[in-house]
A protein has these predicted regions:
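Short, well-ordered alpha-helix to beta-strand connector turns
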Residues: 41, 71-72, 195
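Mid-domain catalytic core of redox enzymes
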Residues: 52-177
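A structural signal for the hydrophobic beta-strands that form the central parallel beta-sheet
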Residues: 45-47, 76, 199
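A structural signal for well-ordered alpha-helical segments within the folded catalytic domains
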Residues: 28-35, 81, 214-217
Length: 241
C-alpha cells in the first residue's frame, strides 16, 4: 500500500535530499549483537530445541520429546506460520489475526558478479535493483559499502537471481506487507497477553532488525519489566496499543 511506502520513506529520511542520516552497521554483522545479547542474558538458553506442542491452560506447558516444561508466560519471537501449528485448541481468536501475516522465501547468494550492478560505478549504492524484459526485479547488496569490507575485491549479495557461480547461498523468509498485514499489525494488540502469550518480531514493523527489537521492548513495557536505560526507548515503529 502507498501509505506504507510513504511512512517507510519518512521514517528512514529517504525524502531528504540534503542532510540525510548516516547509516551505521554493527561490526562483524548481526551475529555479533545476538552473541552479546546471549552472553548478557539472565536466563537458560536451549538451542536446537524441538517443540512438539504448546498447551496453554493455567500457564504454559511446552512438550518436547516426551518431556514437559512449565512456564508462567510465553513470548513467541518467530513468524506465525512457524508456531501456529504447535498451539492447542485455544487459538481461534489469535489465528484470525496472525494468519494475515504472510512470508516469502527468497534465495540469497553471495557472489562477485558485478554485471548486476549499474553500468557506472559512481551509481553503485548499498542497495541496487536490476530489471529485465520480463519485469523481474532483482535486489543486490554491495557488501563492500554496506558492512563495509576491508578488501579490494568486490562482493555482492543478490536475492532470487539464481547465480550459477556463487560463494555461498541460503534461503531467507521475508514478510509480505499487504493492507491486511498493516491492519493486523494494529489488531495484534487485542491478543497480546491472551492465553498468557505475547508476540514479537520484525513482521510487526517494517521487517528490519530494529522492528524486532522495538516489538520486544513494547512487550516488556506491557509486562512492566524494568529495562533500565531502555525504559524510554522508542517503539514508534510498532503500531499496536
Amino acid at each position: 500500500p502507498l501509505s506504507s511506502i510513504i511512512s517507510f520513506f519518512q521514517n528512514h529520511k529517504l525524502f531528504n535530499f540534503t542532510n540525510r542520516p548516516q547509516w551505521k552497521t554493527v561490526k562483524g554483522g548481526s551475529k555479533n549483537y545476538i552473541k552479546k545479547l546471549i552472553q548478557a542474558s539472565h536466563f537458560d538458553i536451549k538451542k536446537s530445541f524441538k517443540i512438539d506442542k504448546i498447551i496453554r491452560d493455567q500457564g504454559v506447558e511446552i512438550l518436547s520429546q516426551n518431556k514437559k516444561y512449565q512456564f508462567d508466560l510465553l513470548v513467541l519471537a518467530c513468524p506465525p506460520h512457524h508456531f501456529l501449528p504447535l498451539l492447542g485448541d485455544k487459538k481461534e481468536k489469535e489465528a484470525s489475526i496472525l494468519n494475515a501475516f504472510n512470508f516469502q522465501k527468497n534465495l540469497a547468494q553471495l557472489h562477485q558478479n558485478s554485471s548486476l550492478m549499474p553500468p557506472h560505478k559512481a551509481a553503485w549504492s548499498s542497495w541496487n535493483f536490476h530489471t529485465n524484459t520480463n519485469n523481474k526485479c532483482t535486489l543486490s547488496y554491495w557488501m563492500n559499502l554496506l558492512q563495509p569490507l576491508d578488501t579490494k575485491d568486490e562482493f555482492f549479495v543478490s536475492l532470487n537471481q539464481n547465480q550459477t557461480s556463487n560463494l555461498y547461498q541460503t534461503v531467507y523468509e521475508h514478510p509480505i506487507f499487504s493492507l491486511n498485514t498493516l491492519n493486523s499489525q494494529k489488531e495484534i494488540g487485542k491478543i497480546q497477553g491472551l492465553n498468557d502469550t505475547f508476540y514479537v518480531g520484525s513482521y510487526l514493523g517494517y521487517g528490519f532488525h530494529e522492528d524486532g527489537i522495538q516489538s520486544a521492548l513494547k512487550v516488556c513495557k506491557k509486562l512492566n519489566i524494568n529495562l533500565g536505560l531502555f525504559n524510554e526507548a522508542d517503539t514508534s515503529r510498532i503500531q499496536w496499543n
